[in-house]
Every structure is written in C-alpha cells, then in structure tokens.
Amino acid sequence: MEVNKLYNGDILDMFSKTPDNFIDLIVTSPPYNVGINYSDWDDTMSYDGFFQWVETWLKECYRTLKPDGRIAINIPYETNFQERGGRVFFTADFYAVMKKVGFNFFGMVDLNEPASNRSKSTAWGSWMSASGPHVCNVKECVLLGYKESHIKLNKGESQWEYEEKEVDGKSKKIYSQEDKDEFYELVFAEWKYFNDSRPLTTATFSEDIPSKAIKIFTYKDDVVLDCFMGSGTTALSAKKLGRNYIGFEISEEYHKISEKRIEDYDRLVRIEKKSKEFFDY
C-alpha cells in the first residue's frame, strides 16, 4: 500500500492490501443508510444488516491503525428507520459497534452548521399542532476513538508554529492569538463548518471537517486514511496540511473526480511557486 495515492475499489478489498499498524488517523464519513442515491452503493440496507457491514470495516480500521492511532467518523445523531418505528439514536448504535471491535472512546464533536443552511421541512410530522410533531435533530457529529494509547507515542512537527521568547527569565513558546483561538475551538468539541455550495458528488464532505481533525489529531508527515473518499476532500486537506494521504473509493466516477482535484491543486502550487520565483528574481 503506497501513501499519497487514491485507490478505486471496494473498501474491504482495499483494506486487505493495507498493512497492520500503518495508519495514524482515519477520518471519514460513511454512508448513513438513509436512501441516498449513490452511484455504486445500496443505501437502503436493513438496520441490522447495515451495522453488520459497519462492523466488518471497523475491524479493518482497528487493525490498520497504529497503536496510538485515532479515528474520526462523521455521522448524524439520529436517522429515520421505519422498520424500527421511526427515529433511532444512530450515534449510540454506531459507537456500540466501535466499542465492540476494540476502540476506546476519545470524545464526540458537535458539528455546528449555520442554521440558514438547514432544511425547514416538517413533512415528517404535524404542523403547528401537538397531534404528532417529530422532534428532529438534523445536526451531525464526529465520533472519536483511539486504538490503544490516547497519547501519541512518537512526537512530530505540530500544526501550529510559535516563537521562542524569554519571559521572566524562562524560555516560553508564544503562539499567535489566531492559532490559540483555533486550538480552543478544536478541543472544546464544537466545530463550525460550511457545506460546499457546489457539491462534486451526491454527499460531498465539507473540507472544514477533515482539516480540523487532521490538525488536532496528527503531526506533519503522519498518514491519514479516508476509506470512503468520495470526491477526495480528506486527501486534499491532508496534502494541504503536509500529511500523507490514502483514499479508498468504490465509485470510478468519484475516484476520477478526486484524482482531478489533487492534480488541480498540484498544478496551482507549481504555478504559485513559479510566480514567486519570478517576482523574487
């Protein structure tokens, strides 16, 4: 398995080629099984069947993560499954499977999308009446887990730069206020994000989500995997932040989109580098 490469194929086939203890961070947003019309995936499995499938790939996530590896999974708090009588606490059931395969709980991030971007439909319940309203939490979260050690065993280069200054006769690391504010947001587990106004796939991953997870949970040059890569947002975020990336995607169409995004970014970097060299000359 090579790093900085995007693989087109079934998730379990791709995991079978991935070594044990190889990945530093898995950050992904899997199908929610809510009937989305994906090009190469049936998003209408039975509830129990869905979580049996989840268990198979979570076992592979656990196997391929390093002992101090982390996992960050973007899912909804609740979903609607008529076979279970309506709303179900999806996050709780998902975490139960994570725990079953061996993951330790590392926290849960509340994703804060501007209210103006949320659906205001009430077709799922009564309107202006106590008859049968459905109290519906449309927000999503990021479930966090770690494999064996919650502390990184091998230190690396941090995301945030600092100046070394002497304060009261002692050397102290001084960070910018902007970086400190960002760190506070990440550790207090309420991440602001904006969905792409021009989605490239059926369910495009907001770049805000993987970039925040990568910043807070990895060092530079760490290996980041997205096993449901979609349009390549996690890989692109990792590349921009100086990490190595791996992506799995079953859809040939989405795989091509993700490769083009990486190629376009590389082209832009080369152009900017040449422009800088020209003006510095």
What positions do the PLM features span?
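Short, conserved SAM-binding/catalytic segment
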Residues: 1, 259-272
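Core catalytic lobe of class I
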Residues: 1-257
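Conserved SAM/SAH-binding loop
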Residues: 8-13, 275-281
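Short, flexible loop/turn segments with low-complexity composition
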Residues: 155-161, 269-279
